[in-house]
Amino acid sequence: MAATPPSSQHRRPLSSSASAASLAGKPRGGGLLLGRYELGRLLGHGTFAKVYQARSADSGEPVAIKVLDKEKAMRHGLVPHIKREIAILRRVRHPNIVRLFEVMATKSKIYFVMELVRGGELFGRVAKGRLKEDTARRYFQQLVSAVGFCHARGVFHRDLKPENLLVDEHGDLKVSDFGLSAVADQFHPDGLLHTFCGTPSYVAPEVLARRGYDGAKADIWSCGIILFVLMAGYLPFHDQNLMAMYRKIYRGEFRCPRWFSKDLSSLLNRILDTNPETRITVKEVMESRWFQKGFRPVRFYVEDDQVHSLADGDNDMPELEPSEPPPPPPFPPPPPQQDDDGEESGWESDSSVASCPATLSSEERRQRPLGSLTRPASLNAFDIISFSKGFDLSGLFEERGSEVRFISAEPMQTIITKLEEIAKVKSFFVRRKDWRVSIEGTREGLKGPLTIGAEIFELTPSLVVVEVKKKAGDKEEYDDFCNRELKPGMQHLVHHMGSVPNIPSDTE
């Protein structure tokens, strides 16, 4: 269910006996939903969910809230799908993908607090007639950029169609409704997906054939159908008889209208290739002449779990106050326990209210002291030692997947300055906020620019821990940066200790 009104054939008004309050858990008498959101009008609904416009009571920011009935979801076996959608939306943070802010639950309802996209569905725009080529191209560029970003993170949408593409007030496209999405770990031993899903008019022939299919190739087929619809105003494969339409899809029987340019027709013929082995890839689409015209790769960074788009030339780094810098935050605790879906466990607890924030709220960001984070105020020696492999705090570089940590006795400003110098060697952009540094690469790719976060935590009054982790981008590029630039450049700042430092206890 998209966070905007669905197309007219799916929308119906609430009956007189059912109000928004009773359906969504909105308190009677104008109260707040779970004490946090003012629920507004119903935007639309499907079989299992309703979407309401709402407003944050703390910040006043408008949001969309998707409400699901927990009992109905469990009865129809949708709980794994819901959990997977939550995990996927947190994995694919991109300017052209609808954002998930928070997930809340009561004993009877599940609430998705999402970005409110005011412009409506792309379907509504094309229903009025075909689009101009430059307009269609811009939407297609944003669609393919978002889809390629998802694929690079092992996510395959599987239900791409104009009804699931929204347009915001700035005219930018947003991909929504990941309810049928698959992740790479769902592949069968043959490396393919086997579940039939999607809308027949937009589904690739190998999916209709109910044989194993490549999720990325199936998604790019759907993108081609969408492009054809935007440019022609009708579907390339259409027939009143469903089986006749299937035959046309299997055979690839379609014709481009005479107003399609040669480059566009060539691109569509390569996308709508019935053989997935020879079908064009996302990378090849993005390199095509028709796609490249006027294309500006999206540039963005993620900070505090918020997606921030960058305008051209917006590379300035916010300066730290030159006077007394804020104290560094305490050393971070271990990440929360996660279940097999990569989602924090406990969301379907029997407690009356459970909340699983995807980001800090605007109010929390305003109230948070400069330089502090939402972490415990203090940790004892055992907590800190447990972070280091084998209880070893010798100061050597420690690697944990996409994270690198080391201990230093150097002044924090010296460490930050060195990080900036290393980044500039690679012509990376640098952003500073308190004792955090964000290093952003310039090389574009399906995964977006490489983004590295570095943060300094106080271990003792004389020692700090520096934590570096990949926040976005290609892992190989990150590993190369760490091995060739970061580790050699920071090695002289690493503090080598003969024993574990004297860490104050909680009672001191």
From Swiss-Prot:
Cofactor dependence: Mn(2+)
GO molecular function, one term: protein serine kinase activity
Comp. bias intervals (Low complexity): 14-24
Biased composition (Pro residues): 323-337
Record-annotated active site: 159
Induction: By light, nutrient deprivation and N(6)-benzylaminopurine (BA).
Ranges of residues in domain NAF: 354-398
Residues annotated to bind ATP: 43-51, 66
GO terms for biological process, alphabetical: signal transduction
Tissue specificity field: Expressed in roots, leaf blades and sheaths and panicles.
Record EC number: 2.7.11.1
Record field: compositional bias (Acidic residues): 313-322, 338-347
Cysteines joined through disulfide linkages: none
UniProt effect for mutating residue 66 to D: Loss of kinase activity
The protein's role, per its UniProt record: CIPK serine-threonine protein kinases interact with CBL proteins. Binding of a CBL protein to the regulatory NAF domain of CIPK protein lead to the activation of the kinase in a calcium-dependent manner.
PANTHER family tied to this protein: CALCIUM/CALMODULIN-DEPENDENT PROTEIN KINASE KINASE-RELATED, CBL-INTERACTING PROTEIN KINASE 19
Domain note: The activation loop within the kinase domain is the target of phosphorylation/activation by upstream protein kinases. The PPI motif mediates the interaction with the ABI (abscisic acid-insensitive) phosphatases.
UniProt family annotation: Belongs to the protein kinase superfamily. CAMK Ser/Thr protein kinase family. SNF1 subfamily.
Designated name of the protein: CBL-interacting protein kinase 19
Gene that encodes the chain: CIPK19
